[in-house]
Design a protein with these regions (language model features):
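C-di-GMP signaling machinery
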Residues: 45-78, 115-122, 294-306
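EAL-family c-di-GMP phosphodiesterase catalytic domain
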Residues: 88, 101-104, 152, 175-184, ...
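Active-site core of bacterial EAL-family cyclic-dinucleotide phosphodiesterase domains
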Residues: 57-115, 282, 287-291
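A generic structural signal for well-ordered alpha-helical segments
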Residues: 3-4, 28, 72, 116, ...
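Catalytic core of bacterial c-di-GMP phosphodiesterases, primarily the EAL and HD-GYP domains
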Residues: 121-188, 263
């Protein structure tokens, strides 16, 4: 089916009507002595269906690219920050930079990221968002860090390396997300070594959500391990989740890493996380994502004082 004559290919390339494409393919198939007459029409239809699928996929990617390009050019997004609290001191230890898109269609950030990846623009979008967050670094209290979500391919790019050359790299945490499987961990680790030597810390997101995150932890030796929200949910009444959290804290202590619990929404969850030995946490109970405050709150959230 891959041996199309020039006539059929010409119709496909020019983008003529479906009937014209089908006729061209049919004539091509009829001209093949190896194709019986009774099969010419079915073969032509199958080829047309395949070609239409390719054209639809190409058009979809083009629309995705245009949407992402428009969002970047129009800056149709805003950076919000969610505080990460030290549960012992009750103070803000850091801020995670998150994104809210204002461009239509209204969709969650993970959909925009997936679309950017499909359109081949993940690097461009992630770097624009990272720069927008870094531009506000000086508004953070000097003793807090800024956590940026980057895919592995973006984090190791030359453009990201240049972007992260800030005055105090020890205040930057690169939170690795995974949109595609990592092909070579040794290469990734080596590529990240330059950032880490300058003081940038590495965090692994979604720990406990699946095998991929655990593989990240084992192969990349992170400074921070972020407990996935699926483990935080119901941890107050699930002995299995509690045991996993305790084990993760024990592992982190032995390798010199820190565990951060995500998605804390109730006081019972907070109590269970504390009981497991987790020192850092974030979630709607403690602070919702929003514009960066100009100064650290004078008082910690009431929930941390109990």
């Amino acid at each position: 089916m891959t041996m199309l004559r020039a006539g059929a290919v010409g119709y496909v390339v020019k983008g003529d009507s479906t009937d014209e494409i089908l006729s061209a393919i049919y004539r091509t198939v009829q001209g093949k002595s190896s194709v019986p007459e009774r099969l010419a029409a079915p073969v032509a239809s199958a080829m047309l269906e395949h070609i239409q699928g390719l054209r639809d996929a190409t058009r979809t990617r083009q629309l995705q690219r245009e949407r992402v390009e428009r969002a970047i050019e129009d800056r149709a997004f805003r950076i919000v920050f969610q505080p990460i609290f030290d549960l012992e001191s009750g103070k803000v230890a850091g801020m995670e930079a998150l994104t809210r898109f204002s461009d239509l269609p209204e969709r969650p950030p993970n959909v925009w990221i997936a679309e950017a990846e499909a359109a081949g623009m993940l690097l461009d979008l992630e770097l624009v968002l990272a720069k927008a967050a870094l531009d506000q670094l000086e508004d953070l209290p000097s003793d807090t860090f800024l956590s940026l979500n980057l895919s592995p391919e973006t984090a190791v790019s030359d453009r990201a390396q240049r972007l992260l050359e800030v005055a105090d790299p020890s205040r930057i945490v690169v939170e690795l997300t995974e949109h595609a499987p990592v092909a070579d961990y040794d290469e990734l680790r080596e590529s990240l070594s330059g950032l880490r030597e300058r003081g940038v810390r590495l965090a692994i997101d979604d720990a406990g959500a699946g095998f991929a995150s655990l593989r990240h932890i084992v192969r990349l030796d992170p400074d921070m391990i972020k407990l996935d929200i699926t483990l935080t949910r119901r941890i107050e009444r699930d002995p299995v989740r509690q045991a996993l959290a305790v084990a993760l804290v024990s592992f982190a202590n032995q390798v010199g890493a820190t565990v951060v619990a995500e998605g804390v929404e109730t006081e019972l969850q907070l109590e269970a996380l504390r009981a497991a030995g987790i020192r850092f946490a974030q979630g709607f109970l403690l602070g919702s994502p929003g514009p960066l405050p100009t100064a650290e709150p004078d008082q910690p959230p009431e929930e941390l004082c109990r």
